[in-house]
């Protein structure tokens, strides 16, 4: 692990955008804190009524889609990989490969602050496996295990 990775305990939106390619409307993590390289991190998503998915999910009853909670956990994991391997500005991509055991436990609505805790189960090479738990005010909203593949640019 590089000295820069060891010194980074959090990632603001500028660093997140230097690590992962996602942008509005599909950038689903605002900040990542408590980064322990190669081990764990906590992503933060502030859910607002301005989210574009609320126009159809559901009119008059805005509920943040469960699949986007899983995607937010995956993006948090990609930032963890990027910090762990010092990948900012290097054009690396972390591709979501699979998901197991996804469960949704509570609605996430505008005004909620979603915290995604991700833990590395296996990693350090091209394929990583994670366990993720998303919560609001300490109450479990969703959980899943998922895997991702690291794609480094050639050359």
UniProtKB/Swiss-Prot annotation:
UniProt-listed InterPro entries = FabA_FabZ, FabZ, HotDog_dom_sf
Biological process terms in GO annotation: fatty acid biosynthetic process; lipid A biosynthetic process
In short, the EC number is: 4.2.1.59
Q: Name one GO cellular component term.
A: membrane
State the reactions this protein catalyses.
a (3R)-hydroxyacyl-[ACP] = a (2E)-enoyl-[ACP] + H2O
Tell me which domain of life the UniProt entry assigns to the organism this sequence originates from: Bacteria
- Which enzyme class, named as a word? lyase
The active-site annotation reads 57
Classification via SUPFAM superfamilies? Thioesterase/thiol ester dehydrase-isomerase
Q: Which GO terms describe its molecular function?
A: (3R)-hydroxyacyl-[acyl-carrier-protein] dehydratase activity
- Key words, A-Z: Cytoplasm, Lipid A biosynthesis, Lipid biosynthesis, Lipid metabolism, Lyase
* Entry's localization field: Cytoplasm
Under the heading PANTHER family, the entry gives:
3-HYDROXYACYL-[ACYL-CARRIER-PROTEIN] DEHYDRATASE
Which family does the record assign? Belongs to the thioester dehydratase family. FabZ subfamily.
Function, in words = Involved in unsaturated fatty acids biosynthesis. Catalyzes the dehydration of short chain beta-hydroxyacyl-ACPs and long chain saturated and unsaturated beta-hydroxyacyl-ACPs.
Q: Which HAMAP family match?
A: FabZ (MF_00406)
Question: What is the protein name stated in its UniProt record?
Answer: 3-hydroxyacyl-[acyl-carrier-protein] dehydratase FabZ
Question: Which source organism does the UniProt entry give?
Answer: Cereibacter sphaeroides (strain ATCC 17023 / DSM 158 / JCM 6121 / CCUG 31486 / LMG 2827 / NBRC 12203 / NCIMB 8253 / ATH 2.4.1.)
């Amino acid at each position: 692990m590089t000295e820069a990775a060891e010194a980074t305990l959090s990632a603001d939106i500028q660093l997140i955008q230097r690590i992962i390619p996602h942008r509005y409307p599909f950038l689903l993590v605002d900040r990542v804190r408590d980064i322990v390289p190669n081990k764990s991190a906590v992503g933060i998503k502030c859910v607002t009524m301005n989210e574009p998915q609320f126009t159809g999910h559901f009119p008059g009853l805005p509920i943040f889609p469960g699949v986007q909670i899983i995607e937010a956990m995956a993006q948090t994991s990609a930032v963890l990989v990027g910090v762990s391997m010092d990948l900012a500005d290097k054009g690396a991509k972390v591709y979501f490969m699979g998901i197991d055991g996804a469960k949704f436990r509570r609605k996430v609505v505008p005004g909620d602050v979603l915290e995604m805790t991700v833990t590395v189960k296996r990693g350090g090479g091209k394929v990583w496996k994670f366990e993720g738990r998303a919560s609001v005010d300490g109450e479990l909203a969703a959980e899943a295990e998922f895997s991702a593949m690291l794609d480094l640019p050639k050359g």
